[in-house]
């Protein structure tokens, strides 16, 4: 099946040394099982949020700063108007170690209500990290993720939250106060 698609505008700038800036505004989404564009909603498995609340304005901005050869620092801010806002801080370190590479990916999301809070209460802080040793075509990693706050981490219904459990087919692991560990071989 095809992935979901969004309608809107996106700009990227690499005009400053070591800095990539991103900004965009989306007003509609076409789900995988649909033939038309619709307003966006918050994912609401098990009734976590008001999944019927809609928005036609998702804005985001942020950037990636290449601090040094192995280290990239990241910050992004996003708002789904009237539903939720989210800040993201992260760093990615990818350095040689022995005959391979050690990759460490740390992510921190801070989420709260936005505007009229039509999706309901949003109170979440999600910390996740994954450390992976890569040697040739093989990689072995270990990760941990912890959610704090009174609610799950919000994200746009039909999209994929990138929080540290990519490739896990059983769950998105975003419930309130949830803690997960993973060991992964690719």
What do the PLM-derived regions correspond to, one by one?
Residues 13-17, 65-69, 79, 95-99, ...:
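Outer-membrane beta-barrel strand-turn architecture
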Residues 9-13, 61-65, 89-93, 129-133, ...:
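Residues on the lipid-exposed face of transmembrane beta-strands in outer-membrane beta-barrel proteins
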Residues 3-7, 55-59, 83-87, 123-127, ...:
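Residues that define the transmembrane beta-barrel architecture of outer-membrane proteins
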């Amino acid at each position: 099946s095809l992935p979901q698609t969004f309608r809107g505008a996106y700009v990227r700038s690499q005009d400053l040394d070591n800095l990539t800036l991103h900004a965009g505004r989306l007003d509609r989404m076409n789900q995988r099982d649909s033939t038309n564009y619709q307003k966006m909603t918050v994912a609401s498995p098990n009734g976590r949020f008001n999944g019927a609340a809609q928005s036609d304005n998702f804005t985001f901005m942020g950037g990636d700063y290449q601090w040094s050869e192995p280290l990239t620092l990241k910050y992004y801010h996003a708002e789904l108007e009237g539903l939720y806002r989210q800040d993201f801080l992260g760093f990615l370190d990818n350095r040689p170690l022995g005959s391979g590479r050690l990759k460490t990916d740390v992510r921190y999301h801070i989420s709260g209500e936005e505007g009229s809070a039509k999706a309901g209460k949003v109170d979440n802080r999600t910390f996740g990290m994954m450390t992976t040793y890569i040697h040739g075509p093989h990689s072995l990693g270990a990760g941990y993720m912890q959610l704090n706050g009174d609610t799950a981490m919000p994200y746009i219904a039909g999209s994929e939250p990138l929080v540290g459990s990519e490739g896990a087919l059983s769950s998105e692991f975003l419930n309130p106060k949830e803690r997960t560990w993973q060991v992964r071989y690719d």
